[in-house]
């Protein structure tokens, strides 16, 4: 398969059980992070920093009880709660996955958000929500999904800047 540098794609799917999947993908001419656990963590860290930056601080992240949380203005109940990031590194892939464990916007502990860089020369980076069960499925597509897609574009731009490309 030939990968074109700079190509962008986005896909949203709603599964039979109501779970949603949203995948944004962009290619780069070279790796944007090292193929190490630190590189895997950086994929996640850049996304969470970009969440706060691009929403002007409306959505803020914090760590509590070995969980990672997103809160509105950093207060009140968690909108989404995640387990600690799980880094994975192989010969041509580096990724960081955050299992969803709850929050006001989740129907329960299901799904994850995963950030992956795959390839060795030209690489594909993905931001993927997998198997997420939104509490309010009717507002997921018009609200949460759009936020994830817009944030995905900003995330890829930030990765590119930080990699100096």
Question: Where do the PLM segments sit?
Answer:
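Charge-rich, low-complexity N-terminal segments
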Residues: 1-74
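A broad, low-specificity signal marking well-ordered, structured residues that form hydrophobic/aromatic
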Residues: 26, 96, 124-125
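Amphipathic alpha-helical interaction segments
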Residues: 55-56, 106, 163
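Generic short beta-strand segments
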Residues: 65-67, 99-103, 128-132
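Hydrophobic-ligand binding "helix-grip"
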Residues: 72-120
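Beta-strand/loop substructures that line and gate deep hydrophobic ligand-binding cavities in soluble
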Residues: 105-142
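A conserved amphipathic terminal alpha-helix motif
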Residues: 139-165
């Amino acid at each position: 398969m030939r990968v074109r540098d700079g190509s962008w794609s986005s896909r949203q799917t709603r599964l039979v059980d109501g779970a949603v999947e949203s995948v944004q993908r962009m290619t780069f001419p070279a790796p944007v992070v090292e193929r190490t656990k630190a590189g895997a963590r950086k994929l996640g860290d850049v996304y969470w920093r970009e969440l706060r930056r691009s929403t002007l601080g409306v959505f803020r992240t914090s760590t509590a009880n070995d969980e990672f949380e997103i809160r509105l203005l950093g207060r009140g109940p968690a909108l989404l709660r995640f387990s600690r990031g799980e880094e994975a590194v192989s010969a041509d892939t580096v990724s960081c996955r955050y299992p969803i464990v709850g929050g006001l916007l989740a129907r329960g502990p299901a799904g994850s958000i995963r950030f992956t860089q795959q390839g060795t020369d030209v690489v594909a980076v993905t931001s993927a929500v997998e198997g997420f069960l939104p509490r309010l499925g009717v507002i997921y597509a018009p609200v949460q999904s759009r936020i994830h897609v817009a944030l995905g574009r900003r995330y890829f731009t930030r990765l590119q800047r930080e990699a100096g490309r």
